[in-house]
Amino acid sequence: MNLQDNIRIVEGFPKKGISFKDITTLIRDKDAFKYAVDKIAGYLKDKNIDVVVGPEARGFLFGAPIAYTLGAGFVPVRKQGKLPYDTLSIKYDLEYGSDVLQIHKDAINKGDRVALVDDLLATGGTTSSVVKLIEQAGGEIVTIDFVIELTDLKGREKLKGYDVLSLIKYDI
């Protein structure tokens, strides 16, 4: 299956000059969604993953079903103030300003084998921040997996030393 056929391209969203890769058409198509989840889960099946981590919000869409398929736990990474218990936090820069990501302090055990799963790799800023949170919690990142990678933005360079998988690659 060519997953790229299931991605809608929206020009000028969220602002002029951007060619937005819309995954809602992929997750709406039961065969494409299952294929994407199965491809990543298949890649992870022999890696003894304890926990799949998914960043808010679209990382939840792929991370949770992959964790279920593997028989692993799922850990959500949320924006500040969304988790009800003690958290670990990291501040990261956005194009205009900054934001804070958090996980529960007890969500990852020391030595847990972790797969980080998200929908899209662009500049790598958010992903590298999540990597720091996972490592701060004591997790061992086994692999970082994406449905889409925007190769021209060179996010993979911020993830050197990690095993990175992407199912679809776009030159923007």
UniProtKB/Swiss-Prot annotation:
Pathway: Purine metabolism; AMP biosynthesis via salvage pathway; AMP from adenine: step 1/1. Its EC number is 2.4.2.7. One of its GO terms (cellular component) is cytoplasm. Gene3D superfamilies: 3.40.50.2020. Its main location: cytoplasm. It comes from the Bacteria. It is an enzyme of class 2 (transferase). GO terms for molecular function: adenine binding; adenine phosphoribosyltransferase activity; AMP binding. Disulfide bonds: none annotated. Keywords: Cytoplasm, Glycosyltransferase, Purine salvage, Transferase. It is found in: Cytoplasm. HAMAP family: Aden_phosphoribosyltr. Belongs to the purine/pyrimidine phosphoribosyltransferase family. Homodimer. Catalyzes a salvage reaction resulting in the formation of AMP, that is energically less costly than de novo synthesis. This is Adenine phosphoribosyltransferase. It comes from Clostridium kluyveri (strain ATCC 8527 / DSM 555 / NBRC 12016 / NCIMB 10680 / K1). The gene is apt.
